[in-house]
UniProtKB/Swiss-Prot annotation:
Belongs to the universal stress protein A family. It comes from Synechocystis sp. (strain ATCC 27184 / PCC 6803 / Kazusa). It holds the Pfam family Usp. This is Universal stress protein Sll1654.
Length: 157
């Protein structure tokens, strides 16, 4: 028996196989936070269990005019590339192939846009990751992704 779970009337989350929802594509947005490192093992376990495609995403936030990445507190494109390479190596050691994506933009919106583009069945994130909203107020990127995501979000404490 196959059960479909629905994220909207037109788009399935994943197929159920014997009562277990299958995640074909898992998106793992990462940064240099401890929470992202802690979530990595959960991601590896899920990918192995579901034989999923793993997509690693890192977002370089746009800087206000006249500020460099260091002054704004965000990673440079070079640092993000190194982060993705290091993460790819960690997953490779566990026999997990990955695809990497690097984007520029507001983290929460970019994560949701990429999830939609790659037809992700699941986003896995650490529980903290602060970014500034357009109003300049600190808000959790994770909380915003939960509210905007086109697919389920697993938050790892």
């Amino acid at each position: 028996m196959s059960i479909n779970c629905w994220r909207s009337p037109n788009r399935a989350i994943g197929k159920s196989s014997g009562g277990v929802i299958m995640f074909k594509t898992i998106l793992f947005p990462l940064d240099r936070s401890r929470e992202a490192r802690d979530a990595a093992q959960m991601v590896a376990d899920l990918v192995k269990i579901h034989q999923s495609q793993l997509i690693l995403l890192s977002v370089v936030e746009k800087n206000p005019p006249g500020q460099d990445h260091e002054a704004h507190g965000m990673d440079s494109p070079e640092a993000v590339a190194k982060l993705l390479e290091a993460a790819q190596a960690v997953f490779s050691q566990q026999g997990i192939a990955t695809k990497t994506i690097e984007r520029e933009g507001m983290a929460s919106f970019t994560i949701c846009d990429v999830a939609d583009e790659v037809n992700a069945d699941l986003i896995v994130m650490g529980c903290r990751g602060l970014g500034l909203t357009t109003e300049g107020v600190a808000e959790s990127v994770t909380a915003r992704v939960i509210n905007l995501s086109p697919c389920p979000v697993l938050v790892v404490p």
